């Protein structure tokens, strides 16, 4: 989920809307369709098929992704996320004059404004665009490609703590809901709850580790006597690469959620994490979309590991391995092994 372009300067609005946003919808719908097809294979007994991919994809777009995206986009607009076809707006910075240092003992001098651009006033061009509509499906579809190069750290893409919360909830919504969908379709709700509980346990353990590591601060700075204790004047901890409006906790929570769901959205700089914090993020990425994972891909990724676990457990106790009434044989294990090893081999 590497974003190697600055959308606000590289892409036109029509490209963002008709190219990238459409692909965000189709990507998420494809994952949901594949997951639903796999669940049907577990649920059905005598049926000859497991459904039509195109029908499932259209249903996922029209009945799930589009309605949720509209609601989320409106909520984000209410928080200050921009939604306009205007390319940019010009603004005059607050600091038009700057002070310059002079030799010791002399008075401080004030320079005149820089080279005039508009009536002698410095002007800043602020990029705008249809941001809220793209951010909504970026988060709901666990895609990650932001309208701006700074992604969800940009103040026009994620301006407030509440918009940050909405974006995190959007990331977790579909992967969590699909666990309950699985339990409902196979006729055993506890099966879906079991998958959700397994995902949540791993997520919470790593979340606690990153919280502790980032709030403890950078040990190299501690040796230099830098004050990294939380107080009324600072959030404390390792604030390098993090937005002040979010602080440690909101940044870390977003970090863990976005890496768990295999989403490329970020609201802080992951390269600036402490060693333990970065280790947890890398571990979530390298799990291969198992802990919640992307829209649809997290569910079928976890089911692949469930099949393997059931097979090993069956061999250990001397019983024929079965999962939801379906026997797990050599062919199923070969296919599960290919699915597990595919991503590491490609990487």
What are these model-predicted stretches?
Residues 1-347:
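Membrane-proximal intracellular helices of multi-pass ion channels
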């Amino acid at each position: 989920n590497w974003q190697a372009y600055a959308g606000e300067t590289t892409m036109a609005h029509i490209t963002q809307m008709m190219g990238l946003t459409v692909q965000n919808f189709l990507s998420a719908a494809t994952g949901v369709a594949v997951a639903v097809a796999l669940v049907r294979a577990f649920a059905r007994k005598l049926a000859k098929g497991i459904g039509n991919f195109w029908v499932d994809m259209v249903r996922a777009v029209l009945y799930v992704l589009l309605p949720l995206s509209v609601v989320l986009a409106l909520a984000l607009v209410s928080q200050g996320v921009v939604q306009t076809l205007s390319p940019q707006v010009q603004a005059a910075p607050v600091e038009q004059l700057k002070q310059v240092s002079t030799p010791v003992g002399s008075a401080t001098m004030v320079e005149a404004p820089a080279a005039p651009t508009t009536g002698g006033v410095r002007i800043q061009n602020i990029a705008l665009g249809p941001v809220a509509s793209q951010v909504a499906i970026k988060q709901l579809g666990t895609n990650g490609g932001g309208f701006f190069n700074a992604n969800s750290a940009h103040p026009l893409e994620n301006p407030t703590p509440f918009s940050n919360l909405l974006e995190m909830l959007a990331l977790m919504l579909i992967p969590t809901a699909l666990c309950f969908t699985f339990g409902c379709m196979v006729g055993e709700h506890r099966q879906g709850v079991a998958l959700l509980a397994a995902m949540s346990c791993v997520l919470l353990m790593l979340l606690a580790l990153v919280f502790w590591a980032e709030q403890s601060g950078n040990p190299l700075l501690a040796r230099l006597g830098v004050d990294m204790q939380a107080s009324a004047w600072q959030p404390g901890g390792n604030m390098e690469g993090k937005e002040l409006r979010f602080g440690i906790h909101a940044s870390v929570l977003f970090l863990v959620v976005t890496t768990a769901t295999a989403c490329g959205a970020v609201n802080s700089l992951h390269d600036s994490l402490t060693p333990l914090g970065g280790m947890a993020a890398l571990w979530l990425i390298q799990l291969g979309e198992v802990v919640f994972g992307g829209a649809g891909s997290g569910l079928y990724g976890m089911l692949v590991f469930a099949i393997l676990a059931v097979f090993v457990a069956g061999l250990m106790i001397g019983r024929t391995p079965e999962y939801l009434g379906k026997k797990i044989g050599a062919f199923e294990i070969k296919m599960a092994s290919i699915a597990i090893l595919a991503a590491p081999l490609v990487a």
